[in-house]
């Protein structure tokens, strides 16, 4: 659905209703339409869509048909220089790696100096070892050229790393928009919170204008005004694991431990509750399966939602 909207913006698909505007200029509405080739919008496809029978230089020149030929070559060569592909101008797509093809597709899209560049999952086809490197170099190029870019991705980590603004969509609707930090630390819905990380969940009880949890009590967040059941959510890294019992800590037994290199993912069963929680700890702490540990949690850093309404705004501190 998100990709379909990118194709609508580019003019590759026709809307059934509504309007599309760019810098207050109508690109499409029921009364007027600007054709795709007149919109000056670049598009980098997921599979790059390079022409196999054209050289790298010719692929980039292809999008510059309205410019005199001698100028086209100069512009294309400059675009390839920007993406560090000058040494491949006479190569053909089948001789290039996935990362090199991606850079050629980027050069072709940037050469006409588009008002907006659309990119569909541009890094998903790359080897995971090269993905971070190519992604960062692409973002650097886009910033150097001051190109406004809409990137479609289903990778939450990628969105947090590269975006200035994120628009999170679910079932065809915008759930939340804002900076990466706003969406991560202040998710307005349970869906938004879960999209960017795994969550632990515990029950609460309302008593004397407070929420009572197994980790202590906290004032009821002001945005939660109904009498519906409220649940507390928190990320695995927020759960503190210690070998020594402290105030408000709960005894738990490690039922599994997964080695992640720099950290461990622990599954913990709270002894006083029929509840299993997840926690990340540094591997240097050397926790083993069946160890007894003590858990504590800063409730002021948790998210609170009504159990039957994932639209409610959360309680969180940044």
What is the meaning of each model-derived region?
Residues 2-3:
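Short, small-residue-biased leader/transition segments that mark boundaries at the very start
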Residues 185-207, 233:
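C-terminal boundary and immediately downstream tail of ABC-type ATPase nucleotide-binding domains
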Residues 16-19, 171:
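Conserved coupling/switch loops of ABC nucleotide-binding domains, chiefly the family-specific signature
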Residues 36, 40-42, 46, 50-191:
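ABC ATPase nucleotide-binding domains
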Residues 199-201, 210-318:
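Non-catalytic connector elements of ABC transporters
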Residues 10:
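Helix-to-loop junction immediately C-terminal to a conserved catalytic motif
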Residues 18-29:
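Conserved ABC transporter NBD signature motif
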Residues 13-14, 21, 65, 143:
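A position-specific signal in ABC ATPase nucleotide-binding domains
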